[in-house]
């Protein structure tokens, strides 16, 4: 999101290329796509999430369990194997207050300060070559990624088959190779 806003609003000189990895140009489109993903969940999980959204109570254990399943399906594993990189296995400090303020209680209910982030119509203003990366099961759904690809004139889209929001973890060798080749081609 930040790179989109920066390139569109400030039109900085000296930027040779941009990389948008599982980002989005529109909070409303993002929310719409998360709600589409929700329809693929069990009826029980859908009901728990719908109840939380309707009441504003995001503390119910049924909701929390449903949201965990949603995030595991579309973001990342809730636990990693012992041999995973340390940055994935160490205990995380959650920035719940900042996340709630900026975005909202979850990925599909944007109520924070970014809820009105809408840049689809301004994507053609991005002139820098832009690499867009996403996974097939990503929070950044193929529709969200394709919207950026269609809107940014000089863009390339790499879709990671079977990957979620953290494609850089799920297929790290391909991800690193892709970024290295992109930067060699555009930023040297």
Residue ranges of model-derived segments:
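Conserved hydrolase catalytic core segment
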Residues: 1-33
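Short, well-ordered alpha-helices that flank and scaffold nucleotide-derived cofactor binding pockets
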Residues: 4-9, 147-150, 181
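Short, solvent-exposed loop/turn segments at secondary-structure junctions
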Residues: 12, 25-26, 137-139, 164-165
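Short aromatic-enriched loop/helix-cap "lid" or pocket-rim segments at secondary-structure transitions
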Residues: 29-34, 145, 170-172
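Alpha/beta-hydrolase
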Residues: 33, 38-124, 128
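Non-transmembrane alpha-helical segments in soluble domains
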Residues: 67-71, 149, 176, 180-183
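Conserved loop-alpha-helix segment in the C-terminal half of the alpha/beta-hydrolase fold
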Residues: 113, 120-163
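Catalytic active-site module of serine/aspartate enzymes centered on a nucleophile-bearing elbow/loop
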Residues: 154-188
């Amino acid at each position: 999101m930040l790179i989109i806003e920066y390139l569109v609003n400030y039109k900085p000189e000296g930027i040779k290329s941009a990389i948008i990895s599982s980002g989005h140009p529109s909070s409303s489109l993002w929310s719409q796509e998360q709600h589409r993903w929700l329809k693929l969940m069990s009826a029980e999980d859908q009901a728990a999430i719908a109840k939380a959204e309707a009441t504003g109570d995001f503390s119910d254990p049924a909701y929390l369990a449903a949201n965990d399943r949603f995030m595991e399906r579309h973001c990342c594993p809730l636990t990693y194997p012992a041999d995973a990189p340390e940055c994935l296995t160490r205990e995380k400090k959650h920035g719940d207050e900042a996340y709630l303020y900026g975005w909202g209680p979850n990925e599909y209910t944007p109520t924070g300060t970014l809820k009105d982030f809408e840049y689809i119509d301004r994507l053609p203003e991005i002139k820098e070559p832009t690499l867009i990366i996403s996974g097939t099961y990503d929070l950044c759904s193929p529709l969200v990624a394709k919207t950026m690809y269609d809107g940014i004139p000089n863009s390339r889209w790499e879709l990671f088959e079977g990957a979620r929001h953290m494609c850089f973890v799920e297929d790290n060798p391909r991800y690193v190779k892709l970024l290295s080749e992109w930067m060699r081609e555009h930023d040297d």
